[in-house]
From Swiss-Prot:
The keyword Membrane does not apply. It comes from Salmonella enteritidis PT4 (strain P125109). Ubiquitinated in the presence of host E1 ubiquitin-activating enzyme, E2 ubiquitin-conjugating enzyme and ubiquitin. Its main location: secreted. GO terms for biological process: protein ubiquitination. This is E3 ubiquitin-protein ligase SopA. NCBIfam families: PRK15377.1.
Length: 782
């Protein structure tokens, strides 16, 4: 029996080892069994030994040189193996075949052949410095593969030492992988050969169809320690899988769907990684190398390990390509900066947070030098593309969101190119958001855009007063944004101190009302009136309000109060009682106008006015009633005889015997889409309408302290009566209902103040059915 030398590199073995190998060959040729001396023999059959659980030890005398050739740990293995070989003699058990001395010899020779080959291979790498296996893999003293040190993780399973027949199709490869993965999941320790899927073909395989769901779950099962080098994954779907300590060197992952795929502690060097555009969630790379791997411009590289780049040429792709280096990774660039290329490569605000800017910036800060170098190469490419301002305009925000932050601000090249871009971005922000609310700032906006706007206001301090609507919003979001840094808040507070010192602002803050009442803002509480907006038309007019009020007026709810602020003229507080909020916002503070109008359109009280006072018959009166809803107090009063008579003529047909006529009641239900509503829902709406007409009759609108239009009081009371008939449960009590009814008419000695009745009813509605009240009551009265 011969020992094959095919796996042994004899050119690197010292002469004494060569002699040992020659000696071993001679022993084998002459019959190694002749060197085996039986010291102990137990004449028992194999079956009897298995039954009794006993074994008869047999010691074999091998040449000491052969024993010394093995590693200490393998000597133990050798001894254990040898002493379990049994020299079974014939015990006259019928049908039992004995193991002959020749079989024993063959068994020992096979064992030795395997270990000699392994030990010699191991010796090659430990003693002679032979080149490591491809991909940086070498064999250590314990026969385990390692990867070169530095910033490269300890991964990459060793190559298989014995050839096996390969599957012939992607389906067969998938079946083989499924079998191996399930065995590993069951706790079986797989050999290197079991985990060797080099040169595999997984094209068009959807892994979720061949693996259990547990492999696709978050924190689920892991595919660990497999060798996928030189494999094809084209058009496959490996989404939601976790590959740990795997090797993908020289593999092709073209058009692979890898949504939320995780690669950890893996070797992905020299990989063609152009994953499919249908990938919804970016794959992640944790402690993984990507040397000379081609990466799409929309990847997340936050966990990648970079090494020094070599002199390799860029990868070749169909149709040609333009590339830049990011450390030792290749990033693909467009051949030409067309409009589509600018949007696709640079506009992460339009592409779900993905762009080449975000890909480069996703690297950890320890790779700042590599990040700056890559961004400079990108800027050079953009500059060489001779892009017009119109072409850059849609991506200005994306550009400044990255390049206007460290470490890129350290680069003179980037600063010089970005300066005009940032100026145009700031001008557009001032033009757009001085008169309308900024979008509700998310984490991205708080961390990337707000600091840029602060920096722009710092460079152009005049804009603080000329665009105080935008400036106050920026400061507001910097001070309240949960994702803003302390540095951002400190800079915002410092800029606001500059703003308050401006001659157009300072006269309004020394009135005992602003901030902490001494002219300084109090940022410890959101209730302090820290914000001061200048009128867009009159520099002598300003609005002072708190953090909470400013937030709610910019992003209102149906319950937002639109009068919870100080209106200042020459620094003095003036009443807003007779000022229409919509006119104030339209003329002086347009930043609130759109939000106010949007809320106003949801108030449907005017529909009842149109039913009672049609524009064809009562155009002037209709306008007076509508105009009164736009302010808290009206200078128009309807208590003169002519007005009282006219109102009585209009409302009398609607109130036969003091109650709503059936026809008018049906008109109300139809106007407010209540025909099929429950009696309670109908009652709540009528109650709120009654509240509004009580306000009409009060001294705040068409009445005075001593008199009010009887028709309006009667109509308000009739609406309330109908609500009581439909659902008494919506009232506080029958006693309260009676009290309100008496006050409308001054019965039983009740004080006839409809202003008190209106306020009381409004408080009750806001507490028990606020959404109904908010859909009806005019904003100025809310």
């Amino acid at each position: 029996m011969k020992i094959s030398s095919g796996a042994i590199n004899f050119s690197t073995i010292p002469n004494q080892v060569k002699k040992l190998i020659t000696s071993i060959r001679e022993h084998t040729k002459n019959g190694l069994a002749s060197k085996i001396t039986s010291v102990k023999n137990t004449h028992a059959s194999l079956n009897e030994k298995l039954k009794t659980g006993k074994s008869s030890s047999i010691e074999f005398a091998l040449p000491q040189k052969i024993k010394d050739f093995f590693q200490p740990k393998d000597k133990n293995t050798l001894n254990k193996t040898l002493i379990t070989v049994k020299n079974i003699k014939d015990t006259n058990n019928a049908g039992k075949k004995n193991i002959s001395a020749e079989d024993v010899s063959k068994m020992n020779a096979a064992f030795m052949r395997k270990h000699i080959a392994n030990q010699t291979c191991d010796y090659n790498y430990r003693m002679t410095g032979a080149a490591p296996l491809p991909g940086g893999v070498s064999v250590s003293a314990n026969n385990r593969p390692t990867v070169s040190e530095g910033r490269t993780p300890p991964v990459s399973p060793s190559l298989s030492l014995q050839a096996t027949s390969s599957p012939s199709s992607p389906a067969d490869w998938a079946k083989k992988l499924t079998d191996a993965v399930l065995r590993q999941k069951a706790g079986e320790t797989l050999t290197a050969a079991d985990r060797d899927f080099s040169n595999a073909d997984f094209r068009n395989i959807t892994f979720s169809k061949i693996l259990p769901p547990s492999f696709m779950e978050r924190d689920g099962d892991i595919i660990k320690g497999f060798n996928f080098s030189n494999s094809k994954f084209t058009y496959s779907d490996i989404s939601h899988l976790h590959f740990d300590e795997c090797r993908f060197t020289y593999s092709t992952l073209s058009d692979v769907v890898c949504s939320n795929t995780k690669f950890s502690n893996s070797d992905m060097n020299e990989v063609f990684l152009q994953y499919s555009i249908t990938t919804q969630q970016q794959p992640s790379f944790i402690d993984t190398t990507l040397k000379n791997t081609l990466i799409r411009h929309k990847a997340n590289l936050s966990g990648v390990i970079l090494n020094e780049p070599d002199n390799s040429s860029p990868p070749s792709v169909s149709g040609g390509g333009n590339f830049i280096r990011l450390g030792d990774i290749w990033l693909q660039m467009p051949l030409l900066w067309t409009e589509n290329a600018v949007d696709g490569f640079l506009n992460h605000e339009h592409n779900n947070g993905k762009s080449i800017l975000m890909t480069i910036d996703s690297l950890p800060d320890k790779y700042s030098q590599e990040k700056v170098q890559a961004m400079e190469d990108l800027v050079k490419s953009l500059r060489g593309g001779r892009l017009t301002e119109a072409c850059i305009r849609p991506v200005e925000s994306s550009l400044v969101s990255v390049l206007a932050h460290p470490p890129y601000t350290q680069s003179a090249l980037i600063r010089e190119w970005l300066g005009p871009v940032q100026e145009r971005f700031f001008a557009h922000q001032c033009q757009t958001y001085n008169d309308v609310p900024l979008p509700t700032p998310d984490t991205y906006y708080q961390q990337r855009i707000l600091p840029v706007l602060l920096d722009s206001f710092d460079r152009n301090s005049a804009a603080m007063t000329t665009h105080s609507g935008l400036f106050n919003q920026v400061i507001l979001h910097c001070m309240t944004g949960v994702d803003c840094t302390d540095g951002t808040r400190q800079k915002a507070a410092a800029l606001y101190e500059q703003y308050l010192a401006h001659p157009a602002v300072s006269p309004h803050i020394h009135n005992g009302l602003f901030g902490n009442y001494d002219g300084s803002p109090d940022w410890t509480t959101r209730a302090a009136d820290n914000f001061l907006l200048l009128s867009s038309q009159d520099s002598d007019t300003a609005m002072m309000l708190s953090t909470d009020t400013l937030l709610t007026m910019l992003n209102p709810t149906p319950d937002t109060a639109w009068d919870n602020f100080y209106l200042l003229r020459a620094g003095e507080n003036v009443s807003t009682a007779q000022i229409s909020p919509v006119e104030l916002f339209r003329h002086d503070f347009p930043v609130f106008l759109a939000a106010f109008n949007q809320q106003a359109t949801q108030r449907r009280f005017g529909e009842l006015i149109d039913i009672i006072l049609s524009t064809e018959e009562h155009g002037e009166l209709n306008q007076q009633f509508i105009a009164a809803t736009n302010q808290k107090h009206s200078t128009v009063k309807l208590i003169d005889d002519a007005s009282v008579s006219r109102l009585a003529t209009i409302f009398a047909p609607l109130l036969p015997e003091g109650k709503l006529s059936p026809a008018h009641y049906q008109h109300i239900l139809s106007a407010y889409h209540l025909t099929d509503a429950t009696p309670q829902k109908q009652a709540e709406t009528l109650f709120c309408l009654s509240t509004a007409f009580a306000r009409y009759s009060s001294s705040a609108i068409f009445g005075t302290e001593h008199d009010s239009p009887p028709a309006l009081r009667g109509y308000a009371e009739a609406l309330m009566q109908k609500a009581w008939e439909l659902s008494p449960a919506i009232f506080p009590s029958s006693e309260q209902f009676t009290d309100w009814s008496d006050r409308f008419h001054g019965l039983h000695g009740a004080f006839t103040c409809t202003s008190v009745v209106a306020d009381s009813m409004q408080r009750h509605a806001r507490k028990y059915f606020p959404s109904v009240l908010s859909s009806i009551l005019p904003l100025a009265w809310a």
